[in-house]
Amino acid sequence: MNINATLLGQAIAFAVFVWFCMKYVWPPLLAAIEDRQKKISDGLTQAERAGKDLELAQAKASEKLKEAKVQAAEIIEQANKRRNQIVEAAKTEAETERQKIIAQGEAEVEVDRNRVREELRLKVSALAIAGAEKIIKRSIDKEANSDIIDKLVAEL
């Protein structure tokens, strides 16, 4: 056997093998590799997009939370104002009612005072007349001396 012929046969077999691989094996491998690279690239792009969407969603959620807190604070403030208004209105109404009751009580006291004063004047004038009758031992004619009695009542 000749080494050159063997080497030449092996070289031809290798060339045929390389040509066969380049023609039938290499294109599907390249297609699979490119497809895999594309899938990985798309996955990374989607991951980046998802990360950005997540950040955006978190920012929106944070903004909504801030708005809700502000709105809650406003509602609480309005409720406190309304409560204060109701309390002030109740205080004002109670003060008005108190003043009315005091005025009514003072009016009743004044009426009772005037009534008692008038009763006292009448009793004092009756006692004065009785005392005067006993002192001078004679009866005073009420109709004739009504001037004296009226002056006496007015002085008391």
Curated annotation (Swiss-Prot):
Gene Ontology terms for molecular function: proton-transporting ATP synthase activity, rotational mechanism; proton-transporting ATPase activity, rotational mechanism
Membrane topology (UniProt): Single-pass membrane protein
Functional summary from the UniProt entry: F(1)F(0) ATP synthase produces ATP from ADP in the presence of a proton or sodium gradient. F-type ATPases consist of two structural domains, F(1) containing the extramembraneous catalytic core and F(0) containing the membrane proton channel, linked together by a central stalk and a peripheral stalk. During catalysis, ATP synthesis in the catalytic domain of F(1) is coupled via a rotary mechanism of the central stalk subunits to proton translocation.
Localization in the cell: Cell inner membrane
Entry's Gene Ontology cellular component terms: plasma membrane; proton-transporting ATP synthase complex
Pfam families with a match to the protein in the record: ATP-synt_B
Protein name: ATP synthase subunit b
PANTHER family attached to this UniProt entry: ATP SYNTHASE SUBUNIT B, ATP SYNTHASE SUBUNIT B', CHLOROPLASTIC
Keyword tRNA processing: no
Organism this protein belongs to: Psychromonas ingrahamii (strain DSM 17664 / CCUG 51855 / 37)
Subunit-structure text: F-type ATPases have 2 components, F(1) - the catalytic core - and F(0) - the membrane proton channel. F(1) has five subunits: alpha(3), beta(3), gamma(1), delta(1), epsilon(1). F(0) has three main subunits: a(1), b(2) and c(10-14). The alpha and beta chains form an alternating ring which encloses part of the gamma chain. F(1) is attached to F(0) by a central stalk formed by the gamma and epsilon chains, while a peripheral stalk is formed by the delta and b chains.
Stated family: Belongs to the ATPase B chain family.
UniProt entry tagged with the keyword Transmembrane helix: yes
Main location: membrane
Keywords: ATP synthesis, Cell inner membrane, Cell membrane, CF(0), Hydrogen ion transport, Ion transport, Membrane, Transmembrane, Transmembrane helix, Transport
